[in-house]
Regions:
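Cytosolic catalytic headpiece
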Residues: 1-119, 151-154
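Membrane-embedded alpha-helical bundles of multi-pass transporters
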Residues: 49-52, 98, 109-110, 115-119, ...
Length: 186
């Protein structure tokens, strides 16, 4: 975007490029082609089994790179070429039509989005800003830990709901017995 804003044509440059311009002309680029992590597709599959209905990748990478990752990992949608403020705007749009949004990130550019998400997850002790903005910090960079965390969270919420229901039922029974004169109130 910086190059386009300065009138430099970079339309035929490779992959996720780092550009070099001189005198308003693109003179070079280094293409960065990140590998898709082996556990990424399996993690998305596990998240779907746990009830995640829709997955969206928000990235600063090119559309070509994003499409490749989404294809390999079975991610439903992507938004590419995003600056940090664009990621935040995209997340707000996604939140409008969703029951709940989990955002996973690891960099300083992710901090505002991690804070805005219903649940922000910082991976691998990313940057200090990301860790401070996140609700959950996964201390290693294994993506499979994300699915494990969602599973454990769902289990904990189930136990919590059961405990609350049990406590309310016991209170109602004791109050009813107390009103009937069959149990002391204290």
């Amino acid at each position: 975007r910086l190059m386009k804003n300065n009138g430099v044509d970079v339309s035929d440059m490779p992959k996720s490029p780092v550009y070099v311009a001189l005198g308003g002309k693109a003179v070079g680029a280094v293409g960065i082609d990140g590998e898709v992590r082996p556990e990424a597709a399996e993690t998305i599959k596990k998240l779907r089994k746990l009830g995640v209905e829709h997955s969206v990748m928000l990235t600063g990478d090119t559309a070509e790179q994003a499409r490749k990752v989404c294809s390999v990992c079975d991610i439903d949608d992507f938004r590419s070429g995003l600056l940090p403020q664009d990621k935040l705007s995209s997340l707000e749009d996604i939140k409008d039509g969703s029951k709940g949004v989990i955002y996973v990130g690891d960099g300083i550019n992710d901090a505002p989005v991690l804070a805005c998400a219903d649940v922000g997850v910082a991976m691998g002790l990313g940057t200090q800003a990301a860790c401070e903005a996140a609700d959950v910090i996964l201390t290693d960079s294994e993506l499979s830990r994300l699915a494990d965390t969602v599973y454990q969270s769902k289990r904990a919420m189930s136990v919590l709901r059961s405990n609350i229901a049990f406590a309310v039922i016991v209170k109602v029974v004791v109050v009813a017995l107390g009103v009937a004169g069959l149990a002391p109130m204290w």
